[in-house]
């Protein structure tokens, strides 16, 4: 059984370039141990596996052949880089600042929704407001995924990791 699994894993990660066969197990294969079960339960998965859940209860958990978008930026309002003090004299000032934050989140979500991905994976955080807009657009979201896992997804899905939502192109979707 162990030999069959090893042979199966190696045969899936063989890369042929310029007539040369190359096997890079460290880069293209990962062993994931899940507690419980028996050795007979072991298997080789063709794809990427990670242990993260979607961020909103109303987002889809099972998606066949998803369009995947990968981001390495926050879907939150940018807080000041340094200590920022804002003096608000009345309620209108506070309302104006809240509206600016909401408009910013709405714009970055619109940039994403325009491409109609089924799944959005980001290495950073996602605000509650962004979760709401994306759930309404039927886009499932996974946040705070490790860079290495994002790179594996990019390689498996043929996607590109984007740093800004306003720079996303159709070719970046996997």
Segments from the language model and where they lie:
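Extended amphipathic alpha-helical scaffolds
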Residues: 1-174
